[in-house]
């Protein structure tokens, strides 16, 4: 990408999209195109086609998505599948129709099989059954990355995909039922501290292992890959480090300053037992994350405190 290239960031108000915009601006890119949902509904094909025909972006970061935690994924299966699939197809297809030089599709590590060998390599995609608790979202994301791959094979496009591990950081979603585990814990422990609660009950038994990547580090990788990688196979984005949900919970409580008891409701689902990405491909390309987990949680908590409205989204 040149510094004056026309770059469209889809989903710029979300955690990932806003981080990509910040990173592009930090690196001196000066022709960044964004649209709010009100200005451009990505699920409406006619609007997307008109936007691409008029704006002709040269590069596209597709970070728009309908996302949520276990509760949302289990109660809105059809919504998650439909909205994600239609917006992905609309953007990717319109980019191809209008001669976009390169597109980067942002997926999720939930695309990998529930019992995939750990750490999960990019090549383990579609080798066995998906995790049922987020199957609808995973299938939609797989469709998006496969469509990019097939366009490359059939039409010679240069469309790449990135599969991040669990993300957190500025502009996260702290909704009580529609957020992911780390922001949900930040909100719960903050509210428990403010209320003087003696105990907090968390789902599951705390044994699942998870990996977390600070979103600004992901954004740095996304720009790096747009400039340095071409290929059909996706690229994993993570730290290569994992932590148990129990230890994560204790770390969040420490950062927030909650000193009460932490209990576990074992009647609730754990989700996937272990999710650690093999990040050797990104490493071999010359990239490495910068933000360690405790520091990232501190920065996230500061962001949460700076804008109380985040908790209401």
Task: Specify the residue positions occupied by each region the protein language model found.
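SDR active-site strand-loop-helix element
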Residues: 10, 35, 60-66, 103-109, ...
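C-terminal substrate-binding subdomain of Rossmann-fold SDR/epimerase-dehydratase oxidoreductases
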Residues: 10-15, 19-27, 191-313
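Conserved beta-loop-beta element that borders a ligand/cofactor-binding pocket
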Residues: 107-108, 145-173, 183-186, 194-202
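NAD(P)H-binding glycine-rich loop region in Rossmannoid oxidoreductase-like domains
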Residues: 45-85, 94-97
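Active-site helix of classical SDR
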Residues: 136, 140-143
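Conserved Rossmann-fold NAD(P)-dependent oxidoreductase catalytic core, especially the SDR/UDP-sugar
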Residues: 89-134
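Adenosine-cofactor binding site in Rossmann-like domains, unifying the SAM/SAH pocket
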Residues: 25-50
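Conserved sequence/active-site signature of Rossmann-fold short-chain dehydrogenase/reductase
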Residues: 43, 111-112, 167-169, 182, ...
